């Protein structure tokens, strides 16, 4: 029996009580004055007056509670033939050291850092190091074109950019440094520093007085014992800016706060994805997208899971068994990826022959999102993997599921082509053009009645007017999903 309906009703009856209870799973330096302040910001703000630190909750807290020797991060890179693991204690040390490096470069609370990196552990370390010192990271998908990167640098105005010499794709190396140099040339805003991770496959020339070598900085900090502690920030302070991937015009900088984000992600790991602390969770996405932010980095680490950072593809690295190898080797219990990945695997291995080569006995659930999950692909995955395949729907703007099938509360019947039910926090309606709710079977605009739940964007970076116009103006009192 699923407890979903009971939980959803409990949220409806007392939204503030529901989220205050969920917030007990997070460590706070100072508790909130109000769970929800309806007078703050564009539609109200969650956990107003509270103080916290996201990196502390992702790392130090687990070390202090005796989880230091558990694996926090598994880096698996078939494209470079490397694997590396970090315990919670090791990852905390690496993050504290790089946070010290950033501080020494003049990065402080509220400053922005653009991260333009491939799928390497240093990308995760840089994100968490920013969170540790209260800086705001803006991750740009590695290899994005120079003009796209330039618009983001111009909008975020970072003190520093953290990048790498290259990304690695099957059969080719993508030089990042020329793209970054061109972006800085195009941008009106010039970052003071660029920290460059030199990867063995391609060394990038460094620009004197601007570019610094990651390894040199980190080794120097370690030799001095330089580590930065966690800085207390307001729950309503930004953790990051993530630009929506619109390739035309000015991209929208989605703002994510610290407090509500942690509360919602921690709740989702147990209740939606059905995983427990200590288990291995794998989101086969990229840190440049929202799935990478929420479910490679923050969600699993907040929950005390082991997260997998995979630098490879569903097929061709080396074959259509790549995903099954990772699941088998690292004892993954739940995986989250895009339907496209499974369409590629199904095309290469329609009979699922590769699946038979691996022990997937510990694997429990597959989650799909990011685009439409066509019923054929879902059925194929169900049939071949013999586990529930859960389609769910959300947005960069929300940071976690709007609709899904909450495994941790007990599975609801799966209906192919449907993301099942709204999560607690989302009062979802289909509206006609006059803002009237439509009955089942009618087509209209999907809208969420305000206020949005914790983790959802409070506004756009430096652009409240555009936020109101894009999301709140079409149907007064509602957030328009545009889906």
Residue spans for each PLM region:
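Gly/Ser/Thr-rich phosphate-binding loop
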Residues: 305, 333-337, 346-413, 427, ...
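ANL superfamily adenylate-forming
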Residues: 80, 163-235, 348-351
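Conserved ATP-binding/catalytic segment of the ANL
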Residues: 244, 447-483
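Conserved AMP-binding/adenylate-forming core of the ANL superfamily
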Residues: 55-56, 73-128, 145, 149-150, ...
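N-lobe entry segment of adenylate-forming
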Residues: 1-86, 90-93, 97-100, 184, ...
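Conserved beta-loop-beta connector loops within the AMP-binding
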Residues: 429-450
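Conserved AMP-binding/adenylation subdomain of ANL enzymes
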Residues: 262-280, 290-334, 347-353
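Conserved pre-ATP/AMP-binding loop-to-beta segment of ANL
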Residues: 69-71, 194-197, 207-243, 250, ...
């Amino acid at each position: 029996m699923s407890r979903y309906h009971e939980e959803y009703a409990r949220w409806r009856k007392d939204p503030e009580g529901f989220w205050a209870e969920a917030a007990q799973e997070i460590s706070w330096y100072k508790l909130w004055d109000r769970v929800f302040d309806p007078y703050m910001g564009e539609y109200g703000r969650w956990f107003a007056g509270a103080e916290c630190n996201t990196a502390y909750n992702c790392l130090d807290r687990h070390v202090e509670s005796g989880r230091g020797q558990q694996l926090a991060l598994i880096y698996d890179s078939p494209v470079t033939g490397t694997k590396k693991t970090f315990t919670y204690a090791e990852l905390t040390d690496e993050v504290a050291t790089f946070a010290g490096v950033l501080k020494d470069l003049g990065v402080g609370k509220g400053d922005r850092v653009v991260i333009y990196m491939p799928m390497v552990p240093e990308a995760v370390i840089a994100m968490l190091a920013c969170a540790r010192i209260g800086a705001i990271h803006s991750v740009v998908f590695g290899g994005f074109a120079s003009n796209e990167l330039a618009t983001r640098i111009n909008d975020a105005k970072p003190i520093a950019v953290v990048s790498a010499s290259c990304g690695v794709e099957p059969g080719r190396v993508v030089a990042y440094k020329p793209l970054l140099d061109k972006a800085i040339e195009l941008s009106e805003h010039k970052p003071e520093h660029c920290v460059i991770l030199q990867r063995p496959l391609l060394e990038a020339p460094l620009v004197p007085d601007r570019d610094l070598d990651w390894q040199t900085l980190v080794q120097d900090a370690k030799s001095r014992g330089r580590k930065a502690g966690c800085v207390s920030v307001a729950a309503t302070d930004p953790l990051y800016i993530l630009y929506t991937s619109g390739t035309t015009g000015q991209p929208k900088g989605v703002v994510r706060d610290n407090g509500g984000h942690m509360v919602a992600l921690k709740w989702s790991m147990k209740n939606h994805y059905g995983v427990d602390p200590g288990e291995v969770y794998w989101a086969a996405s990229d840190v440049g997208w929202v799935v990478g932010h929420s479910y490679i980095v923050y969600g699993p680490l907040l929950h005390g899971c082991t997260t997998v950072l995979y630098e490879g593809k569903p097929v061709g690295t080396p074959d259509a068994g790549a995903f099954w190898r990772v699941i088998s080797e690292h004892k993954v219990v739940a995986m989250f990826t895009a339907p496209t990945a499974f369409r590629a695997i199904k095309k290469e291995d329609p009979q699922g022959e590769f699946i038979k080569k691996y022990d997937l006995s510990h694997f429990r659930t597959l989650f799909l999102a990011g685009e439409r999950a066509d019923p054929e692909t879902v059925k194929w995955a169900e049939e071949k993997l013999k586990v529930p395949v859960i389609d769910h729907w959300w947005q960069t703007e929300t940071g976690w599921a709007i609709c899904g099938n909450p495994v941790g509360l007990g599975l609801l019947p799966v209906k192919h082509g449907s993301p099942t039910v709204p999560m607690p926090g989302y009062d979802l309606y289909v509206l006609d053009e006059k803002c009237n709710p439509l009955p089942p079977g009618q087509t209209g605009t999907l809208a969420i009645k305000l206020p949005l739940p914790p983790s959802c964007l409070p506004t756009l970076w430096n652009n409240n007017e555009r936020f109101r116009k894009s999301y709140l103006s079409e149907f007064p009192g509602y957030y328009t999903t545009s889906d």
